[in-house]
Every structure is written in C-alpha cells, then in structure tokens.
Amino acid sequence: MEVLMAERADLVFHNKAIDGTAMKRLISRLIDHFGMAYTSHILDQVKTLGFQQATATSISLGIDDLLTIPSKGWLVQDAEQQSLILEKHHHYGNVHAVEKLRQSIEIWYATSEYLRQEMNPNFRMTNPSNPVHIMSFSGARGNASQVHQLVGMRGLMSDPQGQMIDLPIQSNLREGLSLTEYIISCYGARKGVVDTAVRTSDAGYLTRRLVEVVQHIVVRRTDCGTLQGISVSPRNGMITERILIQTLIGRVLADDIYMGPRCIAARNQDIGIGLVNRFITFGAQPISIRTPFTCRSISWICRLCYGRSPTHGDLVELGEAVGIIAGQSIGEPGTQLTLRTFHTGGVFTGGTAEHVRAPSNGKIKFNEDLVHPTRTRHGHPAFLCYIDLYVTIESQDIIHNVNIPPKSFLLVQNDQYVESEQVIAEIRAGTSTLNFKERVRKHIYSDSEGEMHWSTNVYHAPEYTYSHVHLLPKTSHLWILSGGSYRSSIVPLSLHKDQDQMNVHSLSVERRYISNFSVTNDQVRHKLFNSYPSSKKGERILDYSGTDRIICNGHCNFIYPSILHENSDLLAKRRRNRFIIPFQSNQEREKELMSRSDISIEIPINGIFRRNSILAYFDDPRYRRNNSGITKYGTIEVHAIVKKEDLIEYRRAKEFRPKYQMKVDRFFFIPEEVHILPGSSSIMVRNNSIIGVDTRITLNARSRVGGLVRVERKKKRIELKIFSGDIHFPGETDKISRHSGILIPPGTGKKNSKKSKKKLQNWIYVQRITPIKKKYFVFVRPVVTYEIADGINLATLFPQDLLQERDNVQLRVVNYILYANGKPIRGISHTTIQLVRTCLVLNWDQGKNGSSIKEVHASFVEVRANDLIQDFIRMDLVKSTISHTGKRNDPAGSGLIPDNGSDRTNINPFYSKARIQQSLSRHQGTLRSLLNRNKECQSLIILSSSNCSQMGPLNTLKYHNVTKESIKRDPPIPIRNSLGPLGTVPKITNFYSSYYQLITHNQILVSKYLLLANLKQTLQVFKYYLMDENGKIYNPDPCSNIIFNPFNLNWYFLHHDYCEETSTIISLGQFFCENVCISKKGPHLKSGQVLIVHVDSLVIRSAKPYLATPGATVHGHYGEILYKGDTLVTFIYEKSRSGDITQGLPKVEQVLEVRSIDSISMTLENRVEGWNERITRILGIPWEYLIGAELTIAQSRISLVNKIQKVYRSQGVQIHNRHIEIIVRQITSKVLVSEDGMSNVFSPGELIGLFRAERTGRALEEAICYRAVLLGITRASLNTQSFISEASFQETARVLAKAALRGRIDWLKGLKENVVLGGMIPVGTGFKGLVHRSREHNNIPLEIKKKNLFEGEMRDTLFHHRELFDSCIPKNFHDTSKQSFTGFNDF
C-alpha cells in the first residue's frame, strides 16, 4: 500500500474541465502506462461517472437556450448592401454573371463565417454554462457548424448537383425559416425531400450501369502468362505511404525484385504486408505488379492478375464473379455517400487568396512597366505582375518596401495614397491538391429580345467552322438592342415584290464604340482579312464584324471595303444622278486580262465619295513579285495623289498609304533577297563576301540566289541582304564608277580597262561598294523593267451599251505605283508584292442647274429576280441644298418609298423620280426583313416609335398637342428618305423645336456634326444623315398597323445640350452603359445606343449590355435577332469544388461516362503527341507507333483510375484500385475500325474488342487500322458480346430488332443472360467440380480415378521442380489435375 501511495505521489493532480482532445491525450497516456485492459476498466468508470453526473445535473435543452448573436442584424444588412451594389454593377455591365455569382457567394460566406466565429465568445460572455455551449464545445453532441445553423445563420446551400445556390438562407433555425428558405434548404439536407428522391436513385442507377458493364467477368484461369505489368515506384513523392500500401497489398508481382544481387521477391508471388514494408524500407527499384489491365484473357480474368480476394486474404478462387463485386464496390459507397451531405455549403472558400496589406499610411510607388491591367476574378480592375515586384510605400518618416510575388494582383494604382492595413495586393493561392478545381460552363441567356451587337472583333472558333460560335479575344460588351419582332407568313408577300430593292444584311455605318470608361476604342480597326482562308487547322480565322462588316450572302463575299470573288465583271447601269454597278460572276465572258485577278471595290467607311476618289481597284498579276527589292523610277516626274480632303476621309482607316501616279510609262524593280533574323542568331557568311545559290546562311535558312552579301545590324535584329549581279573592278579611266546607285539604259557603252566596249542588252543598276582595307569595286545588278500600259480601256470593263449613254458620272482608269522611289520593299516569305494597282476613279459633271454636287453616296443593293441574286453598288449623287417646301424632291428616290396610293408608278428600282405629297404620318415603325429562323414565316424586326419618350425643353401638354396637330399637317421640315443602307445627306437648315423628331420618327437622323463656337446665333446647323436604322424597309400597305409592336419601349429621348462642356463626346452609334455621366445634370438613366444627335437632345435606342471576358464564346451572328431566353454567351470558368460527394457522384459519373468538360480526350491527345515524339527519339520510327499506341492506352487507363480514386479518397472512402481497374478495362477495351487501310473483315466505324482486332490482324497477316476509343459505361453496356444482356439493360426493342436482323448469336457466357433465360449461372467456386461430377456420373470407369490419385502425388513433386517443367508442360495441366482430384474427393 505504501508503495502505491508513493507512486501516486509522483503523479500530478489535475483539476480542470476536460474536452475531447484532452480526453484523447489522457487515454493514450493511460494505454502507454497501464496497457489496454487496465485502461478500458478506467474508462468504464469514467463513463459511469459521467452518466451519473449528467443525470444529477439533468442537462436539458430548451428553445430559450439558443441565444442568437446580437451583431447578426447589422452583419446581414451590410452583406445585403454589398450584394445590392454588386447587382447594380452587373446591371450596368461592369461585372458579368460568373463574377457576380462568385463575389456574392464570397460576401455571404464571409458573413456566415464571421458569425460563426462570434458565436463562441458570445456564449462564453453571456452564459458559459449554457447547455448548448457545454454540449457542442465539449464535443459531446453537435459540432460548431450545427450550432451555428441553430443560432447564427444557415448560410449558403448547394443544390442536388452540388452547384451553389446564390440565395443565402439568412435566418437560423431558432428564428424559423420562410417557405422559400425551407425549400432551398431541402436540397442540401440529408433527410430533405429532394435528397431521398433524387440522390439515392442516382447512386443506384450508377451501380446498375457499372454492374451491367462487368457482369460477365469471372475468374476462369490460374495464370494467363502475361509478362506485362504496371510499375509502382515507392520513391515517388506524389504517392503517400498509405496509398502505396493500399495499391500493393494483395497484388501479384509481375517480375522478380532484386535488392542488389539478391532476389527478395519472385515473379507471381502475392504481396503481403511484410513484403510491402520491406519495399518501403529498402525503397528499391520500381515494383512491377500485375493488374486486370495486363491480363491476356479476353472476356474473363485470371487469378494472378486479380490478386488476393478481398474477403479471405488468399488468392481469389476460380469461378469467383469478380466483375459484379467490382461494380458493387464502386457503386455502393455512392449510396452511402449521399448520406454524408450535411454541410454548410460547398462554397468557393474564402481562403483562395491571401492579401498583402499596407504596413503604414503613405504613397505607394511601383514600376508601371512591369505590370499590366487585368480583371480580378470578381471583375475589379487590377494590375497583374509577371515577375517579382517591389513596391515602396513612402510615409512621412519611413519608407517601407514590400515584395509582391509573381502572378499576383495589385489592387492600387501608382502614386495612390494608401492607409495602414489597406489591402494592396492579392496573392494567388498555390493550387493545392486539396481543393479540387473544376472547369464549369455557365450559359448566359438574354433577358429581352432584340438585335445583337458586339464591340470588338471576334475570332471564329476553329472547331465550329460551320456554326456561329465566336471566341472573344478581349474583354468587351455584348449589346442586345431592343426591338420587337413579329413573325408572319402573310404580310411579307405584300412587302417584297420582284425587283424591289432589298439590302444585304446591313452595312453598319461607321461606329465608334465606347467601353464603360468612355474610352473610344479606335484601336478596334485592323487590317482587313478575307474571311475564307482556312489555313492550318486550329488557326483562328478573324471574323470582323464589329466595325468593318463582313457580308456573306451565299455566293458573294463582301468585306467592307469589299473584296469580290474572282472572275467578276463590272457592269454599270447608270441613270441620271444614280449609278449602279452590278457584279456578275459570269464565267462565259472571260476576259484574258480580268480573268484571274480580283476586283476590289473600295468604299470609304462612311460611304461618301468625293471627286476623284477611287471606287475600285484590281491588282494586275503582271506586276506581282515574290521577292523583296527596290522600286526606282529615276527622274521620272511623279505626283502623289493624296489631297487634303482625302486625308479627312481616310482618318479612320489605319492602312492608308500614299499612291503615286505615273506620268511616264516605265519603272524598274531591282530584286534582292532579304533575310530578317533575330539579333541572337549565328550567321554563317561574312559581310561583303560572295556566295553561290543555296548556301547556308544560318542554321535553318539557305540563300535562294547567289551574289554579294551585306549584313546590317539594327537594334534587335539583323538584316541580311543578298544581291545578285556581276562585280567589276574599275580602272582609273572608268567614269561610271564614281556614281553610286544609278540606272544605265541599254545601248550605252560600258568602259572597262581590259575589255573592249560592249553594248548593254538590258537596263542595269550600278552600285559602288567599298569594303574595309580593300579596293572598292562596282557591283552591277540586273533590273526588271516594267512598262505600264496606259490604263485598260473602259470598254473592256463595261458592256458597250452602257457606256454610250450620256451620263454625268465618269469613270477613269488610272494606274498607281504603290511604293515610293528608292523605297526598299520587304516581302514576308511566301507573299506576293503588288507593285502597281489599277484603280477606277470616279468623277462626275456639274449639275444642270449649276448647283455643284460635292459628294456621292455608295450603298450596296441586292436585287433578286426569280432565283438570281444580283448585287449592285449604288451611288447617290447629293446636291448641297434642298428647297424646303412641303413637297419633297427626291432625285435619288427609290422604289419602296411609301406614297399612300398617290402615285404608284415608281416601282422600277433603277429609275424613279417620285413626288410625294403626304407626310409620313402612317408609318410609325421601321421594318427590316431578317434571316429567317424557320423558312415558312418571314420575320420582321420592328422598331416601334409610338411610345418614344423625350427629355426635352418643351412641357408635356404643349408637346402632346403640337405633335398631334403637326402629324395631321405636313411636316414642317423637308425630309428625304433613301433606302441605301448608307443613306443620303440632306442639309436641315432650320430647327423649329425638338418635337419635330416625332414626326419623322421612323427615321434616324445621324449627325456628322461640327461643333460651332457661336452655336446660339447660327441657325444653319449641322449636316445630317437621314437614314433608316440599318437600312429599314417601309411597309407600303395601309393595313400595316398589324405589324407594330408598340409595347417595347425602344427609343427614348434625352435632353442634352451641345453648348455645355461635356465629359464625354457623343458620337453616333455610340453605346452607353447605364449611369454614365453624359451631361452636367447627372448620370443618365438607361443604357442604349445613340441614334440621333440634335442640338439639344439625343435619341437613344435602349439596349442591354452583357459583359464578356476573353475566352468566352459568343453564340449568334452580329446583328442577328435573339429572342428572350436564347443563349448569348458561354463562360468557362474554374471554381474550387467543395469536397462534398454531392459533387463527387456527378464527377465520378462524368469520368465513367467520359463526358467531362475538362475533356479527358484533349489531355490524352496532347499526351499521345508528347509520347510519340519522345519514343521516336529513343527507338526510331517503325517501333514508335506500336509502342506509342500501347503506352497511350495504358496511360489513359491509369489516369482514369486516378481520377475516380481522387473523388472517393476525398470522401475518406477506400476502394481497392483493382475494382476500378476492372471497370476501366471494360470501357477502354474497344477500338474503332478506321477507314484507311481497310481489311475485308470489319466495316469502318465498327466497334470491336482490342484483343480481337489484334488476333485478326495476326491471322490475316495484314494491318488493320483502328484507334482506341473511350466508351462511357452506358455505351459499353450496349456494346457487349451478348444481346440478351444489352436488351435487359436499356432500349429493349431496338436491341432485339437489330440482333434479329443481324442474326446475332448469344453464347450465354455472362451471368445476366443465363439469369434471364433461367439457366444456371456459370460462376461460383464449386462450379467446375459440379461440371466434372456430372461427367463422371455418366461413363467414367474407376481405373481413371486411381490414375487421379497418382496424379495428385505427381502434382506435389511437380511443385518443387516447377521451373524445369514449365516449358514443356501445357499451362492447364495443374488445373485439370486439381479438378479431377476434387471430383474424386466428393465421390
């Protein structure tokens, strides 16, 4: 007893409350000290004590014990405020849907987390002995998150797919949920309505499909004799020890394992825990194990490839149905895992980014060249730095340096004042393996119907050549311009008669787009591309639509300025002031000159031609060169044709270069070869040396001509030129040599001291070269001479009859040289250089009454006669002044001007001179025919103007009366109207007041305004274009009121005075986001596109912006009509998945059905290419494909197994790899026969088993081409050997009908077929014995059984000498002896 007391005195006496972790520590110390049995007695006593105490204290839980957190109210309010601001930003188009979702989730997540942290201190301060507090924080019952849901807020929930619902549940269970909140919380909750109904069935269906794929796989042999294996390396840092042990235990080695010279494990030995520990301690070579992948049996599996049976730890028995076991082991945890769904929301966790905060107040400075602007994932503007960035913060007395790691976002600007603890940067969290990132697609649908516009160029996605999917190269807005549409099959018949003028889709006027910050994107314009070249696969084809429209209408392809097809003839039909050129592609009348060259029509962007401007040009193939060189035209007189007014026209076009007109008909081209090399490249020839043809210049370039080499080093590159020609070392007498760089005509004598005089045959170019330390010499270079023909005669361009008309429009043909004198021309490789361009110059006479016509308007017109479509360019001559009487004189009138029955004779679109007396009172909307969605009914877009609202200077009452009166009378202002998409230009001289806009409400006045300083005095105001929005067509019928859709508030007016100083310059076609300040009076209220600019107001067509970031795909064409609910954009974004199986199960299914967005196939393809390259290097060509193919299949199988394992492991569920392997083996075991190199056995596109394909190939001794495919589990179950099992799975009628027609035979090898037909299933460990016994019953006499006894002994002896016999004894020998032996025993 004393001893005990003494011992006890050593132990420390504790007196404190004990929680779960302390309890764990205590127990482990007890076990170490006293051993297991003793500890369990102690714990029993503790348990009894606890229960007695609990009964004595009688802890109970009442609803009043749930204390809510006082700060909750304002926290929630704050979060709501933030999400409101966010919603606004989204509405204005500053943030797109994905960013909004992300941010709102993070706002609520943060709020919820904060509340959760507040909870504990709150309990501790108010009532530490609160039963809820005691229970949850001692770990007895309930965890923090559950208590948080009781007293804090339930927070964010996920839906059955594991997607976040971005509507948080703000109340807690103490306060009670509203109906909506209850329904939302049903989704995530375990015993919720949704869970039991939806999830369990999902998991069950998964199991069913899995079992379906592998039901026929049974262990049938002991050893298939394969030599292949999969190697597992113990030293691999990626694999943790636990996973390694799990992978190895129960497997069979495929190869002997040596430790130095000693063999520590033999082939075909199964691995136990002892062996694994030895492998791990020795960390030996990679261990090669056998897996179901490597098994050579076709439709079943052998014992050694399967390994130990999971039930009794011995090698698996013959006849075990391992397939079904595998399917169920994978599917069953799924049903379990749906149970573990209680969670606080699988969220984008807040911990994805660390913040860098400012150490003190001060000014921040950093090097702006190292960063570039970008958006954070919440859509905030930020700077991204690629390399380490040093930021200095200067406060009054001290300078802090902060280092910001690469790939981080800077959230402040240079020289900004920051406060202490302000977040200045966000560090990208390292992608840890724990939070899985997955790529998700999010579609964004349009809220209203309208017309689609976008404000940058887009790429056509190369994968979708034939559809309208575009990729965005940079962040920009998509706009849906509102406009109701009306579908009808009757009305259009009265609209478009034969030969009516219709316009091709719509040529947009010059538009300048505006982004949120009112920065005009002038950089949107680029060089134009032809939209046809589909060069190398995968290159992006530019599809310009925003600024320079591409118009495709079947056979003709205009780019604006348009490029026509080859073989176009130009035809002109001209009447009076108009001039129409049809384009015909007629092959019969091929002119030898015009045949192959392209005529391009060049129209300035705003569609106005001035005198002597170029209408069309074509590049004569005779003046094309493939190589670089210099043009010279010596002393020839030249004048550049760039006049002042042209420059004004062209100020929008980037690609403007002067053209030079020739007086004399000859110029020269001196060829030279130019290589432009990077500065670092090594050059293999010396400066001023002479080389031959095909000499190596650099490592990978060779010269195409021989001659003299000149090397010039520029800043970062080297220009290497090669001149071909002769070298002359001149004597003293030689006069020529003093001149450098002159042209010598043929026929002149050339003096040389040694040789007699020679006459020159051709022109030559002489250049003097003085190398260092050497005598200078003269280099004579050959010259290509070009004669310029004196323009092509117009008669060859246009049919004769057209030219004979007396006409006031003239066309001249002029040749221009495109390069200046002496200017070196650089040709990029494989392009041709056009030296001369033949242009068609437009000119016209004075008008008859002496008023001069300054400009002409061009527009495209498409006329359809029967089924021939002709496209015309139409020129409208515009007089500067128009008399403003009530009648309107319309010299450029068009066939579709509605004239309310007064005079219907002007249907001829080519010539009409209409006088129209009535006002446009009837026509309150504009129509435009569309590309139909469905052929039967024609769709029209309506811009209704019956309910325009105007923010203007008039008061409403007067405004209404005046408008109604004036609509009855004639309009006070002459308005002329033209159908050309580019419109005509009247001068409007007098503003009565701004209400006149409503009279002409179906037109759009587009102004090219000049800001006049003394605007108040002058009444003679701007030039206006008067045009129908995008060239609308009016409806000539009085009954047209059906068409209008007056409920869309499409246009509205905005008071805006030009005389004010404004923050933004307003231009036509410009888009405004909501809340942009236009005038001083404050921000303006709606978003839209400016249609009309007046002196004191604007008309804006309302539009809704959608922001899209780079990489998003845009659906639909520019200008297409979208209806409500159509898909606009698809974003692909990464989000971190919660580790919840609610997302796990769909993930497993995605992998097994092979349909993930992360596209397994893509990564595999890249991997294949990588493999093939490397293997070629190692093995050389013929082997690489063979081995490459084998390896890829193996590689893809392993990566599939890993993907599935990852999901289950994240849930803490252990499934042995071999189960997954069996299934993956089935979905990868089929190959698709491809067309090339067809053998006569399989038809192309047929799915056959991999082994069968290989065997057939060997038997036929010819190659069968096939490629591996990944079938999903559903497809694999419908592509099995047995049609009975397929029919019992899905699509019964179809499968059976097909099988009957093909005459398929079912060999009843699997389990399911036999079950369906009521036979005995061919599995079970006693199965083989059973078969044998039935035989023996019939006719086997007794002597054999004695033999069997002997055989049994013989087998034991064999066992020792196994290696000796292995070669000569057939493989199945042991099997037979064993079977017959069991037979004898049973007897």
Swiss-Prot record:
Descriptive protein name: DNA-directed RNA polymerase subunit beta''
Localization of this protein: Plastid, Chloroplast
Known EC number: 2.7.7.6
Gene Ontology CC: chloroplast; DNA-directed RNA polymerase complex; mitochondrion
Role, per record: DNA-dependent RNA polymerase catalyzes the transcription of DNA into RNA using the four ribonucleoside triphosphates as substrates.
Source species of the chain: Platanus occidentalis
Substrates-to-products reaction catalysed: RNA(n) + a ribonucleoside 5'-triphosphate = RNA(n+1) + diphosphate
Cofactor binding, per record: Binds 1 Zn(2+) ion per subunit.
Keyword ATP-binding: no
Keywords annotated in UniProt: Chloroplast, DNA-directed RNA polymerase, Metal-binding, Nucleotidyltransferase, Plastid, Transcription, Transferase, Zinc
Region (Disordered): 883-903
